[in-house]
Amino acid sequence: VVGSRKIIPETQSVVEHFIKSFKKKDVSIVSGLANGVDESAHLSALENNLKTIAVLPSSLDNILPHSNKNLAYEIVENGGLLVTEYEPGSPRKPENSNYIARNRIQAGLSKLVFIAQSSIPGGTMTTAKFALDFQKLLAVYRSGENFDIEEYKGNKYLLSKIDENFDYKILKFTKKQIEIFQNKLALADF
């Protein structure tokens, strides 16, 4: 589950609903521990007793963002994981390439990548590209009335690719479809 650091209330609700869909299922939620959508995904996973994996752009001795350090500890205390390719003592201020590497790892660890909210450009779009390159299933939230706002421009762009006969596995999710998905998952046997 990935998206903007500047989460809007609609997206907050969507992330919570989407993750709640997996309650009582043997799945782990992967995200990047950033503020906004990532933070919401990890918190929702913990609230629903799901394991969560936080992929870091930094080393374990320099958890970023610092504001989510306690969340990182809570993830581990609840059986989740912190994943990084940087050893302790790595530079304190990660370079842009660290975030791109984090996005690559997130996509690689996931069977399905859910884009909750994305503007253009941004790290979320990088994660979407990795997901498609790795032939992962990509699910993109499609807002109803707010779909033309800046916060969903990345979502809109990705969903436009569905209609261009691209050989991509992109799913569109509206809030109603997430509820239907929740009901079907409740009946599914993983």
Predicted regions and their residues:
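Glycine-biased, small-residue-rich flexible motifs in mid-sequence functional cores and linkers
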Residues: 2-190
